[in-house]
Amino acid sequence: MERRKEILTWNDVDKLIDHLLPQFESTFDSMIMISRGGIIPGGLLAEAMDIQKLLIASVNFPSELEEMERPRLLAWPSFLMFPNEDLLNGDRILIVDDVWGSGRTITAVKNRVSAAGGFPFTCVLHFNPYRNLFGANRPNYFAATTDAFIIYPLEVDRDSTSSLLHNL
């Protein structure tokens, strides 16, 4: 069965950001944006919340996990990029990604922030509880719940012959 797809516009992304902002009851010392999906929402949130200390994390999981029906939790992530521990220690850190599907990537970043002495809080535009591998664990902040495969406006190829929209 083919998964349902949802194609978002930039206005949709703005509305999701507007839905997130009132959820934050306190401030954060810094933000980690997960590459690549968290960079755009992270930038928008950082600007709106005046977070100055912006950091990037890039995580990779073994490719064979993607092909499995239900990926194992025990696979070790490879951190291609991660902030130095002294940038995290003692800070309240907002970790931002576009979507929590399986939850593996953002959970790996959250655990590494905790291990470095930081206080992590997770934030995504979309939470998919149907793909979540972590039971009752969920993002601290999310704008929407979905079962769809989300296509964000930055992912839409503007060339009409090869775009995602053309193939739907």
Set out the residue ranges of the language-model regions.
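PRPP-associated nucleotide enzymes
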Residues: M1-L168
